[in-house]
Structures are given as C-alpha cells and as structure tokens.
From Swiss-Prot:
Family in the record: Belongs to the cytochrome P450 family.
MF term (GO), any: heme binding
Class of the enzyme per the UniProt entry, highest EC level: oxidoreductase
E.C. designation(s): 1.14.-.-
Required co-factors: heme
Record: residues binding heme: C481
One GO cellular component, as annotated: membrane
Function, as annotated: Functions probably in association with CYP78A5 in regulating relative growth of the shoot apical meristem and plant organs via a non-cell-autonomous signal.
Primary residence: membrane
Protein name from the UniProt record: Cytochrome P450 78A7
Organism: Arabidopsis thaliana (Mouse-ear cress)
Length: 536
C-alpha cells in the first residue's frame, strides 16, 4: 500500500509538472497532453507494424513496388535501425545483418524517417552505381554547413556538377597533370623517409601516421595550391591547417541524429554540430581566400598548363568561370579529401607488411631488382608499372581494408529504379553499397580473411577503378572518385620507398593491432608503431 501511495504521488507530481513545463496549470490540459502522447505512441506502433520489411520509412508498400519485395529488418518504431547503426562499425553490422538474413543482393531498412537500401553483392551493386538515376547524393547537414554542397563530392547532378567534374578531370587529375607534379611527390616522400629515420634513431621505434599525414597534406597542397609546409619553420600555419582538417573530418564523419530525425534538431544537438560548423567555416574562408588573393597578385601571368589548380581556376572564363564562394568550396574539398585516403591506406598497407614479413621480403626484392638500391635514386612514377607485386599488395590491402567500406558517401535515387532481380527502388531512397561485405564474402573471394597479394598476380589481376564491382574501393559510375589515379600513384610510391629504405618489424611493447574505427573513413583504431631498420 505504501508503494502504491508513493507511486500515486509521483504520478500526480508529473501530471502537474509536465504541462506546467509547457506553460499550463490546467488539469484539463494534463489529460489532453496525456491523450496526445498516447495517440502518438499508438500511431507510431501501428505505422511500424504495417510497414513490413524495412521498417517505418518503408510504409505504404514502398518496398513492394516491384514483382519482388525488398526484404529487410523492421527496426523499432520511429527510430528504425538508428540505434543499431549509430554506434560501432556500421559496415560490419550491415554485413552481418545481410548474411544472416540471406539479403546480400539488397536489404531495406529505416534510419528514422529515411528509407535506405544496402547492396552487398557485386552485380546489384553495379546496377546501382552505374545507373544515372543514382547520380545524386543525400546531403548531410554537416556537408551543407561546410560548403560541400557546392563542391564535386556533394553538388547535385546537373550542369554545375558536370562542369566541376570536367575541370578537375582535365586540369588536376589528368595523367599529364599527375606527371607534372611528380617532383613534388618525390620531395614529400624524401622528407617522410628522413623523418622516419630520425624518429627511429631517437625513439627506438616509429609511429608512422603523423609522417604520412604531413606528407599527404603537403602532397595535395603542392598540387592544388603550389605550396608546402615545413613542420619547423611554418609550425603555426601547419597547426592551424591540420586543426581545420581534423575538425572537418570529425564533423563530416560524425553520426548526426538530425539527418534522419529532422525534428530532433530543434532541441537536441549532441555534438554541437551547428556551432562547430559556424566556427570552422570563417577559418576556412580566411585561409583559402588568402591563398587565392596571393595567386591573383603573383601568378597573373602564369598559364594554366604550368600552374597549380588555383591558377587553373583563376584562368577560367565564360561558362566555366566560378564565383569566389564556389571556388573556396571546391578548393577546401580538395584539401579535405586529398589528405585522408592516401595516408590511411598507406598505414594499412605497412601494417599488413609488418605482420607478413615474407610478403615484405618478396616486395623488397621486386623493388630492388626493378629500381635498384639508394645509389640509383628514388622510385619514379615510371617504375611503378614494372612492379606488379607492389600493385598486388596495394590491391589486397584495399580488399581487406577498404578506406570507405560503405563507399564513404551514399547515393540518392532521383526516380523509381527497376532492378534486374525484379525489385524496384523508390524515388528518394538513400542507397549504399557495402564494399566491405563484398570483399569479405567467401562466395566472392576464396579465404577472404587472409592477406594474400598472390590473388592479384598474373592472369588473376583485375581493374579496381570501377570496372569490376568485386573490388571497387573508389566507387563506380558517374560519382566514381575523380582522384583515384593520383591517390594510387602516391600510395604505391610511398610504400615502395618505405619498403626499399627500411625493414619493418613489430614493436614488441606495442604489437600491431588491426582493430578498426569508422569515422569519415575506416582507420586503424591504434596508430601503427613499428621498429625499422635502415637498409641504406
């Protein structure tokens, strides 16, 4: 009885306190509020129950437009599968869900009010990525706030986006442009090798990540802005730039509940996204505008064929001429995207070589045979074609550790899309491809958990630039990564030099851990620490 009285008092308190919090002291309003709450709960449960496969965002039969229904988990009312995917490693969770339900072709689920499908099978993945009806991307709140909706990655499919793509493909990522900046990549690599040697001699081991990140930053800054940073002489400027890039990574890679439950953004912002974006954007504008202004003054006579990418953008005229805000957005995206994948892919590759010394030895023998020792100079871009085992090692790393396991950024259907399996994906659906699931599927790859570069040697070699969806880490179709060739050239050169110059072994006080953390890309959770022995 005492417990019942206590419960009654608690109930009475909340019946008065809740409406009072909304500005009411009328008990009639209390019952009205209660009825409204119960009605919302009831309708949410009914909607969820009737939605069927895929959950609440697939209500009204959205998953049954074709002759074959799209299967998938219901999740829970209102939230769908948000709680399942908002923590941990989403690519592994989705793969486990698809494999356990035999839904590898395609699986529907709900992220709040957002209908989502994920493909975990190469043929359906190809249909999605190659379809012109999936050429758009859903724009996250952070991407819009950080100006990415006016850059190549997130700009909607149309005249403006095609123009940006053409400019980048012609003036930054074309083979002749990549070759023109070879000397800069060679310089970045030489500085990294020197820094690795200094750290090993001073500390007895090397944490590779910071050296890779600096080299990646200087690589993209050199080709895009025509400048590089000395970590000692320009420490303040370098710290500011790396701080901005790191903050951008965190904001764009963070799971923002308001992207899927828009009403939540009015009163809940757990990561302070709006405030942090508002603080970061002026810093970006100041940095990039300063560089643009410097180019306007000092490079007014420089031709686009011999200048950097800023010179190219400033030289454009007519329909191709960009407004300054658009130019800032495009250049900021180049910095942002260019400093991520190359560094983390190289770190994953070196970690696997530390764990597989036989592979490391075979790779070093190939490099020394084709290129020679230190007396013959550094590895050149022209040498990379003579190193098939090196290319196989990088491809196998991309298979085991795709930097964008869900291809980083999803696609958005602009109309109903009929697939070959009889399913129809409705207009307005967010589409993902789980590349990690495909590259770890034993029906696609033999012994998929084993690091085995031999699977890419000889006649078993394959195109990884979007032609074969068994391994397409850079995507495919209209939204394939435009910088894939530059990125691969950079990573293979770095790995070649690091293996040629040093022997890499485990630090027994901190063994290599291949645990993952999924941010904007999939990184090593614990940075690689190794003991290196200088060869020459």
């Amino acid at each position: 009885m005492e417990l019942m009285n206590l419960a009654s008092k608690e109930t009475s308190y909340w019946m008065i306190a809740l409406p009072a919090g909304f500005g009411s002291q009328n008990l009639h309003d209390v019952s009205t509020l209660g009825y409204l709450f119960l009605a919302v709960v009831f309708l949410s449960i009914v909607t969820w129950a009737l939605a069927g496969g895929g959950g609440v965002a697939w209500k009204n039969g959205r998953n049954r437009l074709g002759r074959v229904a799209i299967p998938g988990p219901r999740g829970i009312p209102v939230f769908g599968s948000l709680f399942t995917l908002s923590r941990g490693l989403a690519h592994r969770t989705l793969a486990a869900m698809a494999w356990s339900r035999a839904n590898t072709e395609i699986m529907a689920f709900s992220l709040g009010s957002t209908p989502v499908i994920v493909a975990s099978e190469p043929n359906i993945a190809r249909e999605i990525l190659m379809s012109p009806h999936f050429a758009d991307r859903p724009v996250k709140q952070s991407a819009k706030s950080l100006m990415f909706s006016r850059a190549i990655g997130f700009a909607p499919n149309g005249t403006y986006w095609r123009m940006l793509r053409r400019i980048a493909s012609t003036h930054l990522f074309a083979p002749r442009r990549i070759l023109a900046h070879e000397a800069g990549r060679q310089l970045d690599c030489a500085e990294m090798v020197k820094a690795v040697s200094v750290e090993q001699n001073g500390a007895g081991s090397v944490v590779l990540r910071k050296h890779l990140q600096l080299a990646a930053l200087n690589n993209i800054m050199g080709s895009v802005f025509g400048r590089r940073y000395d970590p000692l002489a320009q420490k303040e400027d370098l710290d500011e730039l790396t701080s901005m890039v790191r903050e951008g990574f965190e904001l764009l890679g963070a799971f923002n509940w308001s992207d899927y439950l828009p009403w939540l953004g009015y009163f809940y912002d757990s990561i302070r996204l709006n405030q942090r974006c508002s603080d970061l954007v002026p810093r970006i504008r100041t940095l990039v505008k300063k560089i643009i202004d410097e180019h306007r003054v000092s490079n007014s006579e420089k031709k686009r064929d011999i200048g950097d990418f800023v010179d190219v953008l400033l030289s454009l005229d007519g329909d191709e001429k960009l407004q300054e805000d658009d130019m800032i957005a495009v250049l900021w995206e180049m910095i942002f995207r260019g400093t991520d994948t190359t560094a983390l892919l190289t770190e994953w590759t070196m970690a696997e070589l530390v764990l597989n010394p036989n592979v490391q030895t075979k790779l070093r023998d190939e490099i020394l045979t084709a290129v020679g020792d230190g007396a013959d100079g550094d590895v050149a871009d022209a040498d990379l074609a003579k190193l098939p085992y090196l290319n196989a090692v990088v491809k196998e790393t991309l298979r085991l550790h795709p930097p964008g396991p869900l291809l980083s950024w999803a696609r958005l259907s602009t109309s109903d899309v009929q697939l070959s399996n009889g399913m129809v994906i409705p207009k307005g659906t967010t589409a993902m491809v789980n590349m990690w699931a495909i590259t770890h599927d034993q029906t696609v790859w033999s012994d998929p958990l084993k690091f085995d570069p031999e699977r890419f040697t000889g006649n078993a070699d394959m195109d990884i630039r979007g032609g074969d969806l068994r391994l397409a880490p850079f995507g495919a179709g209209r939204r394939v990564c435009p910088g894939k060739n530059m990125g691969l050239a950079t990573v293979t050169r770095w790995v070649a030099e690091l293996v040629r110059r040093f022997e890499w072994g485990q630090d027994q006080t901190e063994p290599v851990d291949l645990g993952e953390v999924l941010k904007l890309s999939c990184e090593m959770e614990h940075p690689l620490r190794a003991v290196v022995t200088e060869i020459f």
